[in-house]
């Protein structure tokens, strides 16, 4: 039977970024919720996102990737009036993105889905008072991995596509990734023991081994990559710190912008104090710099 500490780590990995930013119960002013907007379809099922607009939106938007262990769960968008209060209070439009979820879908599917979500948001940006050049992305754990994939592999749209969504770019302006896996090479056949110890993490990794490099953001950093902030605990055993230190080194070999914040004593998740004193301030300083109006 798994130990309580192992179960806690599993929960943090599978829950992703849910508790990453401290917040209290109500935004300063009522926010408008546009729920269950369909950004695509897969196997006859809808891919959905929620857009939450603060009363005094500043034009920038943050896509919150609802992903932990590459599982993407639905919850009432009203919950993000609580979890996302800090974003709304700073006048960011908050976009909750769900991708095709494990166990049915695997990592490459999730990557493709979040790319499409960015394209959709760009397509519909004017409808929601969003500047498409001021899109940030935030995610923890698997959501952090997907954030870095978006930051490093953004592409222009295909003007000739019959799918109007695909005519728009998948580029973002900035990303914030908490404890992200950055190098998935070897994860399909020989994942680290800490991953093998969590049975729920097996299904999302059951994909063609040849695709591992394509979903390893560390291999896709270029001068054109979006600014990336990584926040990682030095006691993380599930996704060790080297994932972010190696990513930082890859960024430093280019003219791309990156920063790594190491949280001393933190494992795969942060205490309320670490969230309030480190994660929140670093996140909003990053978005404040790279999502500001030009």
Where are these regions (language model features)?
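Short beta-strand/loop motif that positions the catalytic acidic residue
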Residues: 230-232, 236
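Short beta-strand element of the alpha/beta-hydrolase
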Residues: 59-68
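Catalytic histidine-centered segment of alpha/beta-hydrolase-like enzymes
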Residues: 266-276
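Short amphipathic alpha-helix adjacent to the substrate-entry channel of hydrolases
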Residues: 76-95
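Primarily recognizes the serine-hydrolase "nucleophile elbow" in alpha/beta-hydrolase
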Residues: 116-189
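Mobile cap/lid helix-loop segments that gate and shape the active-site cleft of serine hydrolases
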Residues: 29-31, 36, 41, 151-153, ...
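Conserved alpha/beta-hydrolase "acid-adjacent" motif
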Residues: 237-243
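Catalytic active-site module of serine/aspartate enzymes centered on a nucleophile-bearing elbow/loop
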Residues: 276-294
């Amino acid at each position: 039977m798994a130990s309580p500490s192992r179960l806690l780590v599993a929960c943090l990995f599978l829950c992703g970024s849910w508790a990453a930013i401290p917040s209290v119960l109500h935004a300063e002013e009522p926010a408008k919720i546009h729920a269950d907007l369909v950004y695509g379809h897969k196997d006859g099922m809808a891919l959905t996102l929620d857009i939450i607009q603060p009363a005094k939106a500043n034009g920038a938007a943050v896509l919150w990737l609802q992903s932990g262990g590459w599982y993407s769960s639905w919850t009432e968008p009203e919950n993000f009036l609580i979890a996302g209060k800090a974003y709304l209070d700073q006048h960011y439009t908050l976009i909750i993105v769900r991708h095709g979820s494990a166990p049915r879908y695997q990592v490459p599917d999730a990557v493709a889905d979040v790319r499409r979500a960015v394209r959709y948001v760009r397509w519909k940006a004017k409808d929601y008072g969003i500047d498409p050049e001021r899109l940030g992305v935030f995610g923890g754990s698997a959501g952090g991995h997907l954030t870095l994939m978006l930051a490093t592999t953004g592409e222009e749209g295909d003007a000739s596509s019959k799918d109007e969504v695909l005519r728009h770019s998948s580029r973002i302006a900035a990303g914030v990734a908490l404890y992200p896996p950055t190098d998935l090479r070897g994860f399909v056949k020989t994942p680290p023991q800490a991953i093998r110890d969590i049975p729920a993490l097996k299904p999302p990794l059951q994909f063609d081994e040849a695709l591992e490099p394509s979903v390893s953001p560390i291999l896709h950093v270029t001068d054109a990559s979006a600014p990336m902030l990584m926040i990682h605990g030095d006691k993380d055993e599930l996704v060790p710190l080297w994932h972010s230190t190696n990513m930082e080194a890859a960024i430093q070999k280019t003219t791309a912008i990156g920063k790594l914040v190491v949280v001393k004593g933190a494992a795969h998740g942060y205490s309320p104090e670490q969230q309030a004193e480190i994660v929140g301030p670093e996140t909003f300083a990053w978005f404040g710099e790279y999502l500001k109006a030009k």
